[in-house]
Regions:
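A structural motif shared across PLP-dependent enzymes of the aminotransferase-like
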Residues: 117-130
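Mid-domain Rossmann-like dinucleotide-binding core that forms the NAD(H)/NADP(H) cofactor-binding site
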Residues: 147-220
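A glycine-/small-residue-rich N-terminal strand-loop-strand element
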Residues: 76-117
Length: 371
């Protein structure tokens, strides 16, 4: 069987190719899944491409022997030392049909399941049954390929909001599959949500999904509209997928302006309600910048947010609850759309990688290793 791997070499190059490996054998509590659908998420590209220079890409070989090669800047090679020479399997999540199973989970043979555990860009994958979600009748692998990363991230944002005492959310890159899920969750759960996009057509799209507050960062009155949306919702927590540039700083500044509007007494430290931005993506590779005048007071925070530690801290009961909701709503709230379905060999095409590596909203690729 073949699986897609990414390897950093001693000569400061990264190589992506297909490795031929033995079909895995399931243990007593494991499932052997024929993978039929696995999405290309930004987190997958972090392993597949990482800090390599995509503009230096070249191709060698053909078919299953194709190798994509890119240069890795010498300045980051020190951080890559632990993975030099090690073929790293790629693909965080996916779905397929159970073709074999351990003695304790034989009842799942023939079932469609989604799973998470890495190495999903492969024809077959063994995963613990506990890492999988069994799907109902009529659900195919394409329908449930994205059952973990985006759905649980969106749900995790809402859970984080509740745990930290906030009452409304701000979300950037809101026209993404994840953003659409978050709109549906917040509408269903009665949570105010401010959506930030960067194109006029994205505003109309999200409004058609029921979004009440959509701010276009490309508009000249973006900051004013964001302040008004924050005043209306009292949003003091934001999740930023861009991870670079000045957007996080703008959000904090607009939160502060909205917060000061409700102050009855002056404070040299700004509004007293804590304002928080969590960065959970890296769509913008530039440095994060804040206004020179620190226009958001002193009650604020910026940090990273990751799904894995959130789930680890949430506990088993909450994990089961969230996964069950995803399973119940996989064709509605958590349904994902894809631009194109490609094979493992197609994923090594120069033309294809130059599209899916851009991580553009509305251009989501799905790999079908069974093709």
């Amino acid at each position: 069987m073949f699986q897609l791997t990414s390897t950093i070499k001693e000569n400061a190059t990264l190589e992506i190719g297909l490795s031929e490996v033995k079909k895995p054998v399931p243990g007593a509590d494991d499932l052997l899944i024929e993978v039929q659908a696995t999405p290309i998420n930004p987190s997958d590209l972090g392993t597949m491409i990482g800090a390599a220079d995509v503009t230096s890409i070249r191709s060698e070989g053909s078919g299953t022997d194709t190798k994509l090669i890119m240069d890795v800047p010498e300045s980051v090679m020190w951080a890559m030392k632990p993975r030099i020479g090690i073929p790293m399997p790629v693909g965080n999540e996916g779905a397929g049909v159970v073709v074999d199973a351990g003695e304790n989970v034989k009842h799942l043979i023939g079932k469609v399941v989604s799973g998470v555990g890495g190495g999903m860009y492969a024809q077959y994958r063994v995963l613990p049954a506990m890492s999988c979600i069994e799907m109902g009748e009529g659900i195919n692998p394409r329908d449930c390929a994205s059952s973990f990363v985006n759905p649980l991230t969106a749900l995790g944002m809402v859970e984080t909001m509740k745990a930290e005492g906030h009452t409304a959310l701000i979300h950037t890159a809101a026209a993404s599959n994840l953003g659409k899920m978050l709109i549906k969750i917040c509408n269903d759960d009665g949570i105010e949500l401010v959506n930030i996009v960067r194109k006029k057509e994205q505003v109309k799209l999200l409004e058609s999904l029921g979004a009440k507050y959509v701010c276009n960062s490309s508009d000249k009155n973006f900051k004013d509209s964001l302040v008004e949306a924050i005043k209306s919702t009292n949003a003091t927590l934001a999740f930023d997928a861009t991870g670079g540039g000045d957007l996080s700083g703008i959000i904090l500044s607009c939160m502060e302006i909205a917060g000061r509007a409700n102050m009855t007494e002056f404070s040299p430290y700004g509004s007293t309600h804590h304002k928080q931005v969590y960065i959970y993506g890296a769509l913008n590779q530039s440095s994060i910048s804040f206004p020179n005048n620190r226009s958001f007071g002193m009650y604020w925070g910026v940090g990273g947010w990751l799904l894995t530690p959130f789930l680890a801290n949430a506990g088993m009961e909450k994990n089961i609850e969230l996964r069950q909701r995803v399973s119940n709503e996989i064709m509605t709230t958590f349904h994902s759309s894809y631009t194109k379905e490609i094979s493992l060999v197609d994923a090594l095409s120069l033309d294809e990688i130059m599209v899916y590596a851009k991580i553009e909203t509305g251009k989501k690729y799905l790999i079908n290793p069974s093709l």
